[in-house]
Amino acid sequence: MVVVGLDVGYGDTKVIGVDGKRIIFPSRWAVTETESWGIGGKIPVLSTDGGQTKFIYGKYASGNNIRVPQGDGRLASKEAFPLIAAALWESGIHNDGSPVDLVIGSGTPLGTFDLEVKAAKEALENKVLTVTGPEGEVRQFNITRLIMRPQGVGAALYLLNQGIIEQQPGYGVVIDVGSRTTDVLTINLMDMEPVVELSFSLQIGVGDAISALSRKIAKETGFVVPFDLAQEALSHPVMFRQKQVGGPEVSGPILEDLANRIIENIRLNLRGEVDRVTSLIPVGGGSNLIGDRFEEIAPGTLVKIKPEDLQFANALGYRDAAERSM
């Protein structure tokens, strides 16, 4: 029995595979009819219907026909299915074409949790997913169980197991800064149960900063910059149209504004319960950029996570939850 942790986000898909192997790729895919080549050689082309419909995914999928998941953790969505197939393909599970029994740990935001879990189990549990690779090789994944946890709980469980946070009186607030949204999950640190009335989703994410930077670069160069290039330009300068654009000096004010909006909304939603917060836990890719600012919400409570774990915290927790369920 193989166990994987899977976090299908609107921005990126994260996987914890065999022997703890970590994989991350942009959550986008596109149908293709021909073989493609890049600088590094042949671009991976997969199929889930015996080769009739082929698709490319991740950084290789670009252009007007790309498809993305409908939201974080929407595993039952037809737009997420190729991403699940790609994640399992890259997870390090190899076989001779016969089905490999698999348990998937995953999650979805608390607000739609029950609905999404029911749909995901109906779509995936006790199903055999057959994936055909670029050389015609076939791998079959028999999904025997799907273990779901609310987004943010996975990260908290992982940190608890690592000894980074402790069970104690008070609240832990997991702030997951994603592409479209910032999901805030408040957990009672004594029993690790979500506090529903203090958990919420903000329609603010790193995508807002990327769009703002993209507009700024377009004004400077006269050309519309691709989304993935603008995303890269948030953290360091990049070359675009033979000109160096972006970088911290340009993106700094934009990220400051993003952090201010998130902090203001979190304070508003937590209302008079801020004094009970003992751990602020930023996770997600956006936390690499603005996570340190969140200490302003409750000074002295910020939990520092290794930068390499920030994006994978939920997936690590999902995998741990799946292992514990066996």
Curated annotation (Swiss-Prot):
InterPro entries: ALP_N, ATPase_NBD, MreB-like_C. Optimum pH is 4.5-5.5 for the polymerization reaction. One of its GO terms (molecular function) is ATP binding. Signal peptide: none annotated. Keywords: ATP-binding, Nucleotide-binding. ATP binds at Y10, G11, D12, T13, K14, S179, Q231, G285, G286, S287, N288, Q311. Optimum temperature is 50-56 degrees Celsius for the polymerization reaction. Gene3D superfamilies: 3.30.420.40. Belongs to the thermophilic archaeal actin family. Mg(2+) is required for polymerization. 4 mM MgCl(2) is sufficient to enhance the polymerization; however, higher concentrations of MgCl(2) suppresses polymerization. Polymerization is also suppressed by addition of NaCl, KCl or CaCl(2), with half suppression by about 100 mM, 10 mM and 18 mM, respectively. Polymerizes into bundles of filaments, forming a helix with a filament width of 5.5 nm and an axial repeating unit of 5.5 nm. Polymerization of Ta0583 requires NTP and is optimal with ATP, but GTP, UTP, CTP, and even the deoxy form of NTP can also support the polymerization reaction. Nucleoside diphosphate or AMP-PNP does not support polymerization. This is Archaeal actin homolog.
